[in-house]
A protein has these predicted regions:
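Terminal helix-turn-helix DNA-binding modules in bacterial transcription factors
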Residues: 49-89, 109-126
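Short non-domain terminal segments
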Residues: 12, 20, 84, 93-94, ...
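Basic/polar phosphate-binding segments, predominantly the helix-turn-helix DNA-binding elements
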Residues: 25, 29-61, 81-106
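Basic, amphipathic alpha-helical hairpins
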Residues: 1, 14-27, 46, 50, ...
């Protein structure tokens, strides 16, 4: 077994990679390959050190990004799809609903303030 310090360093490197790449790469294999380890080992170490799996962390970063784009930008859903490199609106919608219980549009309507809604509707359709 590796010393805990090595596992913490590996986890830290994983987080650095995720922060730089989660918008374009959501595959555990990508991060494992970047760190020259197997996906199984990466998942085990990250879970041991942080309490969550590598996939869960990647997903969490992506959901936070999507929530931010939905509530703090005037981008429409198609523009968000392109910015986050989902294959289409359906795949983004399924991913978002699976992790939040709401569609992207439901989330946007629920969390935009009245002022934001007014400004947003001038530029876009919700």
């Amino acid at each position: 077994a590796l010393p805990i310090l090595h596992k913490k360093e590996l986890t830290h490197k994983f987080f650095q990679l995720v922060m730089s790449n989660y918008k374009v790469n959501r595959s555990v294999t990508f991060y494992a390959n970047s760190l020259c380890i197997t996906p199984k080992y990466l998942t085990m170490v990250v879970k041991e050190v942080s309490g969550k799996s590598a996939k869960d962390w990647i997903t969490e970063y992506m959901i936070l990004e999507l929530k931010g784009l939905l509530t703090n930008s005037t981008l429409n859903i198609q523009e968000i799809v392109e910015k986050t490199q989902f294959s289409n609106q359906s795949s983004l919608g399924r991913f978002f609903r699976r992790h939040t219980g709401l569609s992207p549009l439901q989330y946007r309507k629920k969390y935009l303030t009245t002022e934001q809604r007014t400004n947003f509707s001038k530029n876009n359709t919700i």
